[in-house]
Design a protein with these regions (language model features):
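Eukaryotic partner-binding/assembly regions in large regulatory complexes
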Residues: 1-59
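Short alpha-helical segments that sit at the start of domains
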Residues: 60-95
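Accessory beta->alpha helical hairpin/"wing" motif in late/C-terminal subdomains of nucleic-acid enzymes
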Residues: 55-60, 135-162
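Short, amphipathic alpha-helical interaction segments positioned at domain boundaries
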Residues: 148-190
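A short, conserved structural fragment
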Residues: 41-49, 125, 129-141
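Short amphipathic alpha-helical interaction segments
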Residues: 28-36, 113-130
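Short acidic, glycine/proline-enriched loop segments that cap or flank alpha-helices
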Residues: 87-94, 112-119, 137
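Short acidic, hydrophobic short linear motifs in intrinsically disordered regions
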Residues: 14-23, 89-108
Length: 190
């Protein structure tokens, strides 16, 4: 499962009730840590344990890496911003969002300047679920605007505060450049 999910959390949230439950895969990693580490070393991977976040994750040359599309990256940035704001404002019990709130953050920050397709939302939600950033109470295809989406702290591992601010600025500059291009008259180049 570590190869399919990229990390294993100590607590997983029940997709229906969104209540925390112990993850048996985490306990297996704790019990057999040295064997798993030796096995993964042969494959060119390293299993890293983060005791503060209570996760095991793969890293190294043998670990699968995935390039996210720009749209997925922007959605991850928005979810990271929501997570930060909820933790700072309401504490750990408030780490639930929904598509409506993500869209609102996107409009307010200028990161989502167009309506995203259902396929773009599905891709982003699927990848965030695969990488243990979120938990959905239903299949990705069944998620509606008000469906609760539980946010895991692992989103902090994928997007640091510095990375988040840098990417937001970069995407805003790109959006501004595109807006200027659209407003230029057709004969401006002549």
């Amino acid at each position: 499962r570590l190869f399919r999910q990229t990390c294993i959390l100590q607590l997983r949230y029940d997709p229906v009730t969104l209540t925390p439950r112990d993850n048996p895969d985490y306990e297996i990693c704790v019990r057999h840590r040295h064997f798993i580490e030796n096995y993964l070393a042969v494959l060119g991977c390293e299993m890293e344990h983060d005791p503060q976040e209570h996760i095991f994750r793969l890293k190294g040359e043998g670990a699968e890496t995935e390039k996210f599309s720009q749209t997925t990256t922007m959605i991850i940035l928005l979810v990271r911003m929501i997570y930060r704001d909820k933790i700072l404002g309401e504490g750990l019990g408030a780490t639930v969002t929904n598509l409506g709130e993500i869209r609102e953050y996107g409009a307010n920050t200028g990161l989502l300047s167009r309506k995203l397709t259902a396929a773009e939302w599905r891709e982003a939600l699927y990848l965030m679920g695969r990488h243990q950033m979120i938990e959905l109470p239903a299949a990705v295809r069944d998620v509606k605007d008000e469906t609760p989406i539980y946010l895991y702290s692992t989103i902090l591992l994928y997007v640091s505060a510095a990375d988040m601010n840098e990417l937001i600025e970069e995407y805003r500059e790109e959006a501004d450049d595109e807006a200027v291009q659209e407003n230029l008259p057709a004969d401006a180049d002549q």
